[in-house]
């Protein structure tokens, strides 16, 4: 399938101005000045799209999404629905990192990894963190490093809550251990080993992060 987007305003991410974009299958093969590209009439499977008054950008990366739904802090009826590929891509998100929030009980790591795999199968790039607000971290295997090392979709730990009334109020030693275990998992797997932190409005502020 060949697609030609004509006369579209491109940010790549730098501003390129009005251009034509030629796409073959799922790859951009050429970007040229507006009006300079065309598809020969003898190509049976082709589509031309008028990009006038439209903007084309790379897909956005959203590194904190409750793909299983959020909420629940006001009771069971307060839970929000799962994210969908259509809902994400509608707003230009093509890479997503899923996480659990306050509720690591009604939603768990098995469900989060399964949801992440499903989004990947649908065509979006999807990853996730191991854990939720709580410390000790509830992992899928028996450890943070093992989760990150052995499960393709898991790239770090989170969302760990600090300085928040919904947090487990981790000590400095506990928070340091989470950081060290996440770092180890990243080193062993060749991943970044990210820690995603939820920071509330408590008086401790960023104290734990600064000390670590």
Question: Which stretches of residues belong to each language-model region?
Answer:
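Hydrophobic/aromatic beta-strand patches that form the interior of the parallel beta-sheet core
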Residues: 5, 47-49, 61, 97, ...
């Amino acid at each position: 399938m060949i697609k030609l987007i004509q006369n579209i305003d491109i940010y790549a991410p730098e501003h390129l101005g009005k251009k034509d974009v030629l796409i073959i299958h799922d790859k951009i093969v050429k970007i040229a000045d507006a009006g300079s590209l065309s598809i020969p009439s003898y190509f049976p499977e082709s589509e031309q799209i008028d990009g006038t008054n439209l903007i084309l950008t790379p897909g956005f990366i959203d590194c904190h999404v409750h793909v299983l739904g959020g909420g629940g802090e006001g009771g069971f009826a307060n839970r929000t629905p799962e994210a969908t590929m259509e809902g994400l891509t509608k707003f230009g998100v093509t890479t997503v990192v899923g996480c659990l929030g306050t509720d690591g009980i009604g939603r768990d790591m098995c469900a989060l990894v399964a949801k992440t795999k499903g989004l990947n199968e649908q065509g979006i790039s999807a990853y996730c963190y191991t854990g939720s607000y709580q410390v000790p971290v509830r992992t899928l295997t028996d450890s943070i490093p093992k989760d990150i090392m052995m499960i393709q979709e898991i790239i770090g730990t989170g969302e760990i809550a600090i300085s928040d009334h919904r947090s487990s109020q981790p000590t400095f030693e506990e928070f340091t251990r989470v950081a060290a275990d996440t770092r180890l998992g990243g080193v062993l797997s060749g991943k970044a080993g990210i820690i995603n932190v939820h920071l509330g409005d408590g008086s401790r502020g960023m104290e734990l992060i600064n000390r670590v």
